[in-house]
């Protein structure tokens, strides 16, 4: 199967054609041609272009230009009265403009009535121009600064002056001084300073002139009925008594009440500072103007009502209204135009506000003009000037009417500096609605008075291309009709047909087009589901160039294949044919106004393209083809007991979600299960027990989508699979790890069956840690006493006490497995020898390692205290001889007064440690007063975790408490004067003991010795012994 192939040109040409087609028609290149402007130049510094008017008489087209500061060759004695110039469009190769002769008075003081003598100096002739809307329509030209000097000794009266010029621009016209009244001479009162003609409008029967200076600048509108040559008067006292509102600053007229009646509109831009606009019914019976509608501006100083345009935007026969507020500001004078749509009987409803590009100081809305039907779409169009945009270069925006009122987006923006860099205040005046070059389309004329220039911009013919894309009604995805190689594939025939028509368009055109498949997917950045096959090549789009004949249809035929394993069989397959004109050759060009190349019709800012779509067939039992998906699931933590109620950060490496999805309804197309997960999880894999056509794709870091079943999930089927996520990067900032699992399909699903389509699985996240603390003391012991050298201790400035430095280092260690988000350590030191004793320790500093924490403690206000006791030599000696062995100071024992410090840590990662260094001084003067020979200090430190931070301490882990011990040893040597006393008392005691013994011995007779008897007895004994010895020898 197949159709004719597209021309196989170079890839470069194809890319160029694609760029042209996709780009569409830029806003600056619709059917007004800025490349070939017709430029008219006026006298220097004359404000040539302040007002412009397109005009025709018979077959001659003219551009009429007001130059309100020009000198007049017909009135050389008048100082800068201003002039109206006529510029012929055809047969005027030099673009010359000539002044209209209005047969005006040439001298100051020319009579103009019983009590009227004119002064034309600086009268600003040409400040406004208007044309009667018919074939031989006359022209209205005004000079609002024209003055009546009849009473110049008392008052000079700026009545204003208008002149009706015949259609042929040659015969003498009619003079209008609408504010002149005989014998009225006071400036300001009534119409004495009315300045009529500052704005003017012409209908078939009415001449409308604004007079903003009447009634002390309350203003009014002067309306002349040409049928009976009478003026319609405004008698509304409420309006007339509102001074300084400037009613009549802008005027227009239209069919507001009924398609057959004319109503008059006047703007009062100073009314209450915000501006107003009024619509008046012209009641010819009473000869008055009766107010039927009013609207107010929205911001102070916006000058709402300073420009007006009545135009039937939606083609319902009733005029709609555009009101300019050129000084409307968000930043500075960007300008705004409010659009009011006529709902009948003069009831207007605000539709929207237009702002152009909202450029700084643009004064968008300074001028508004109806252009008639610029592009032949059946609805009138309008131009809005922004003369100060681009630093006074100026711009004009073109907006199109439609059945709804007005298209909010402008179709083109005409930039003055791009048309001609010399243009200044381009857009101050605009005129349109007349075909100036004879090609059947109305053209637009724009004034740029600060460069004394006028530009005629011609409209190009507009081509309407009719495009049809023919597709099969549906695609049966279960019955392939084509082959791609050896593989059967689904396919469809695609036919595109083109024809064109338009007003005054060429008989033949060249058309570039690009036919794209499945554009809805491409616009979403997704892969298309179909592709074209041309001569064995596959491509996502077809690019061709056609030659079309007027009102004849040309068709092309193609074959598109459906990709295998298409997931989405619910959304339609959209084909789009985007097209653009090829380069058009216009033939021989005329010297003055060469023919313009046509353009394609603008589609209200949309892409110039045509779309059609087809769908996949579906096999459904119910009319609404409703699926009924049911979702079940369970969390499984790896390497964890099922009884564990939380996920320990760092302990669990991955987590699995076991999912079961069932379909109890019709076949579910594009069935999928999506997972909204934490961005800290990483998708590892999807597991299924057997191949069931399930595939998963991570669309975002926190969004996983799994397609279930291909090409659809059958009715009464069930699928089970698991998705596995890596949890090693969880930070723990979230309290709960949640999974939102949703089952959905492209089918509709009844509301009563949606309750089981979503599953929320959650598990708390906890920090599981095993903390421990160790400590060391330096020194572990020291000796104190009176005989200990003072150099072993330190003294603080101006203090007598001797201090022993004590340094303690504590280390907190986190074994893991989780990071410890925060912890604290409490430390206690025995600080007094007794409950009422003085404080012994003075903490100098506590430092947390790496500055990842802070400590707090209570400083000792009086670190140096020397206990003062009443000296008693006998008590001192007694204490020396009765010193006990060891005293233990432990904060856990009752009655012990302790110093407590606290330290808080920041996060402590797994297998990391944190140290606390404590620098203290111990007052040894207090120790000296104690009777113990050894004082043992037991300092304790304990690490604590905060349950509020979701921290769990592992049971039966490392100890969270440590005891650090050091000892103070007394040297047991008494003071010097005590030693003397001990020696003296010892001698005294010895003598007393000796005397006591002597007395005792004396009393016992120790000193009564019988020396004589003893000696004699000893002598006798010796003799006896001697005689015994002799006897024995003789035997």
Curated annotation (Swiss-Prot):
Matching Pfam families: FG-GAP, Integrin_A_Ig_1, Integrin_A_Ig_2, Integrin_A_Ig_3
Effect after changing residue 750 to C: In a breast cancer sample; somatic mutation
Extracellular topological domain: 30-981
Cytoplasmic side: 1003-1035
Entry keyword set: Calcium, Cell adhesion, Disulfide bond, Glycoprotein, Integrin, Membrane, Metal-binding, Receptor, Repeat, Signal, Transmembrane, Transmembrane helix
Gene Ontology annotations of biological process type: cell adhesion; cell adhesion mediated by integrin; cell-cell adhesion; cell-matrix adhesion; integrin-mediated signaling pathway; negative regulation of vasoconstriction; neutrophil chemotaxis
UniProt binding sites for Ca(2+) 2: 373, 375, 377, 381
Marked site positions, Cleavage: 565-566
GO cellular component: basal plasma membrane; external side of plasma membrane; integrin alpha9-beta1 complex; integrin complex; plasma membrane
Glycosylation sites noted in the Swiss-Prot or TrEMBL record: 225, 476, 493, 612, 654, 658, 672, 676, 807, 854, 904
Membrane topology: Single-pass type I membrane protein
Localization: Membrane
InterPro entries per the UniProt record, alphabetical: FG-GAP, Int_alpha_beta-p, Integrin_alpha, Integrin_alpha_C_CS, Integrin_alpha_Ig-like_1, Integrin_alpha_Ig-like_2, Integrin_alpha_Ig-like_3, Integrin_alpha_N
Transmembrane segments: 982-1002
Motif (GFFKR motif): 1005-1009
Binding site for Ca(2+) 1: 312, 314, 316, 320
SMART domains registered for this protein in UniProt: Int_alpha
GO terms for MF: integrin binding; integrin binding involved in cell-matrix adhesion; metal ion binding
Additional comment: Expression is increased in small cell lung cancers (SCLC).
Protein name per UniProt: Integrin alpha-9
Biological source species: Homo sapiens (Human)
